[in-house]
Amino acid sequence: MYRQLVNILTALFAFFLGTNHFREAFCKDHDSRSGKHPSQTLSPSDFLDKLMGRTSGYDARIRPNFKGPPVNVTCNIFINSFGSVTETTMDYRVNIFLRQQWNDSRLAYSEYPDDSLDLDPSMLDSIWKPDLFFANEKGANFHDVTTDNKLLRISKNGKVLYSIRLTLTLSCPMDLKNFPMDVQTCTMQLESFGYTMNDLIFEWLSDGPVQVAEGLTLPQFILKEEKELGYCTKHYNTGKFTCIEVKFHLERQMGYYLIQMYIPSLLIVILSWVSFWINMDAAPARVALGITTVLTMTTQSSGSRASLPKVSYVKAIDIWMAVCLLFVFAALLEYAAVNFVSRQHKEFLRLRRRQKRQNKEEDVTRESRFNFSGYGMGHCLQMKDGTAVKATPANPLPQPPKDADAIKKKFVDRAKRIDTISRAAFPLAFLIFNIFYWITYKIIRHEDVHKK
């Protein structure tokens, strides 16, 4: 009985021992096939080498899904700052974070415990990246203070996030017909350079494709909240290329132009009206005031165009400056008319004296002919001593007419009436112009722009 019990225990011990040997042998065989050693995990360096190193078989020159469906790249941008908008060169400057996301199944992993890996920017050269460029870019630069402003993140499922900080100068064709009450639309176009739509497609991120930093302000514009997102697919001789775009609406603020252009020109026009209250005999004062205001207005008009491109159409500021210059010049011409009318009495009296002199000479000649022609003496007169002399009509200088003062007063009153009418007509005409001007550009055309 005792011996049977010992045999049973020995058999059980041998069975368990054989099972353990088999398990260890199986684990070793499995680990050797998978390239792992028992009780050993990969280091980060070994893992990256295995994932995208030379021994991994990963080729950064070949896109994901090679010879398969195109790679979908979702993009979004975060605007850090919106720089100067320049009318002369028609461009704007912007600082952004550009983020691109795509899926590369070759970078999927399960051997590493982390759900995602934030890698050094130097690893960007080891993976495939979309060949994105900005179609309307005029200048750009990367940022490397204190290190390269780039981010590379790879998720377990092979999703890649590539973020980079850029400062861009982008072209922005502007319509300045309503300047400085205009609303400009500036675009940003993201396009593939070498991959056609058979290989690569850009799309906007569905959640927050374009984000703006809080408190972002521009010196002369208000950045509208509504932004238009769309596609701008390009067709070239080399193929059809994917392109996406965003349109920014910038409404110009008038504060600067009111202070620097509109108010000074308005005051110059009002100053030109002061001559209507100056005595018409003070010619030096009125002429000097008129010429000064004309020259000042000309300088002001030239200054308003200095910061603008030489376009072929008329801008709103051009109309304002032209009308102001017209009013100032008209005020100078008004004094010329006043001075001319006030001096007309002298010419009138001179002509009147000439006419009277001619009439008197004709009367004397006619009278002398009548008195002496009957005696056959013609124009000769016989004196008491018997001598004959030729009768010559008297030609005394005419005396000024008795109503000369009345005539002078009549013309002076006409000149004064011109000044009196101008004092009311000029401000009224300028007021009517202002009403039409501001209604047209601030209400009618402004609404048309917003409808578009």
Swiss-Prot record:
For binding glycine 3, which residues are annotated in this chain's numbering? 238
Intracellular or extracellular location(s): Postsynaptic cell membrane; Synapse; Cell membrane; Cell projection
Gene Ontology terms describing biological process: cellular response to amino acid stimulus; cellular response to ethanol; cellular response to zinc ion; modulation of chemical synaptic transmission; neuropeptide signaling pathway
Superkingdom, according to UniProt?
Eukaryota
**Disulfide linkage:** 172-186, 232-243
Which InterPro entries does its entry note?
Answer: GABAA/Glycine_rcpt, Glycine_rcpt_A, Glycine_rcpt_A2, Neur_chan_lig-bd, Neur_chan_lig-bd_sf, Neur_channel, Neuro-gated_channel_TM_sf, Neuro_actylchol_rec
Q: Which residues lie on this side of the membrane: Cytoplasmic?
A: 279-283, 337-420
Q: Which residues bind glycine 1?
A: 99, 163, 238
Transmembrane annotation, as ranges: 257-278, 284-304, 316-336, 421-441
Q: Where is this site: Important for obstruction of the ion pore in the closed conformation?
A: 295
What residues does glycine 2 bind to?
99, 163
Q: Which UniProt keywords apply?
A: Cell membrane, Cell projection, Chloride, Chloride channel, Disulfide bond, Glycoprotein, Ion channel, Ion transport, Ligand-gated ion channel, Membrane, Metal-binding, Postsynaptic cell membrane, Receptor, Signal, Synapse, Transmembrane, Transmembrane helix, Transport, Zinc
Deletion phenotype: Loss of glycine-induced currents in cortical neurons from 17 dpc embryos. Still, mutant mice are born at the expected Mendelian rate, are healthy and fertile. No effect on glycine-induced currents in cortical neurons from seven day old mice. Baseline nociception is not changed, but mutant mice show increased hyperalgesia in response to mechanical stimuli during later stages of inflammation caused by zymosan injection. Knockout mice show impaired learnig, short- and long-term memory deficits, and impaired long-term potentiation in the prefrontal cortex.
One Pfam family, please name it. Answer: Neur_chan_memb
| Residues annotated for Zn(2+) binding in this entry | 226, 228, 249
Q: Which residues form the signal peptide?
A: 1-27
Q: May I have one GO cellular component term?
A: intracellular membrane-bounded organelle
Q: Which reaction does it catalyse?
A: chloride(in) = chloride(out)
Relay the record's extra comment: The alpha subunit binds strychnine.
The family database entries (NCBIfam families) matched by this protein are listed as: LIC (TIGR00860)
Query: Which protein family is named in the record?
Result: Belongs to the ligand-gated ion channel (TC 1.A.9) family. Glycine receptor (TC 1.A.9.3) subfamily. GLRA2 sub-subfamily.
* Function in brief: Subunit of heteromeric glycine-gated chloride channels. Plays a role in synaptic plasticity. Contributes to the generation of inhibitory postsynaptic currents, and is involved in the down-regulation of neuronal excitability. Plays a role in cellular responses to ethanol.
Q: What is this protein called?
A: Glycine receptor subunit alpha-2
Taxonomic classification: Eukaryota, Metazoa, Chordata, Craniata, Vertebrata
